[in-house]
Swiss-Prot record:
Molecular-function GO terms, alphabetical: RNA binding
Coarse class of the protein's main subcellular location: cytoplasm
Stretches assigned to the Sm domain: 14-85
Gene Ontology CC: one annotated term: U4/U6 x U5 tri-snRNP complex
Subunit composition and interactions: Component of the heptameric LSM1-LSM7 complex, which consists of LSM1, LSM2, LSM3, LSM4, LSM5, LSM6 and LSM7. Component of the heptameric LSM2-LSM8 complex, which consists of LSM2, LSM3, LSM4, LSM5, LSM6, LSM7 and LSM8. The LSm subunits form a seven-membered ring structure with a doughnut shape.
The encoding gene: LSM6
Keywords (A to Z) from UniProt: Cytoplasm, mRNA processing, mRNA splicing, Nucleus, Ribonucleoprotein, RNA-binding, rRNA processing, Spliceosome, tRNA processing
Biological process according to GO: maturation of SSU-rRNA; mRNA splicing, via spliceosome; tRNA processing
PROSITE patterns assigned to the protein according to its UniProt record, in alphabetical order: SM (PS52002)
Record-given protein name: U6 snRNA-associated Sm-like protein LSm6
Native source species: Mycosarcoma maydis (Corn smut fungus)
Length: 85
């Protein structure tokens, strides 16, 4: 394996950098249960508790509910991804 292949991507930042960069942007939050919440990331804390605005709930890819604001407890979060919008 070449030395370049062993090096991490130089453009990859830390998870903390990613989270700071997506505040105020559209994100998808996947819960351990498989439910997705998509909305604007308002804030989060050190426990990964999340506040979303303009939130839409998806179950198995199907829109189920819309919420103005949603608060998600951090221990339920599997991952957060940035959305294109």
């Amino acid at each position: 394996m070449s030395a370049a292949a062993q090096q991490p991507n130089a453009k990859a930042g830390s998870p903390n950098d990613f989270l700071k960069g997506v505040i105020g942007k559209n994100v998808n939050v996947r819960l351990n249960s498989g439910i997705d919440y998509r909305g604007v990331l308002s804030c989060l804390d050190g426990y990964m508790n999340i506040a979303l605005e303009q939130t839409v709930e998806y179950v198995d890819g199907i829109k189920k509910n819309s919420y103005g604001d949603a608060f998600i407890r951090g221990n339920n979060v599997m991952y957060i991804t940035a959305l294109e919008k």
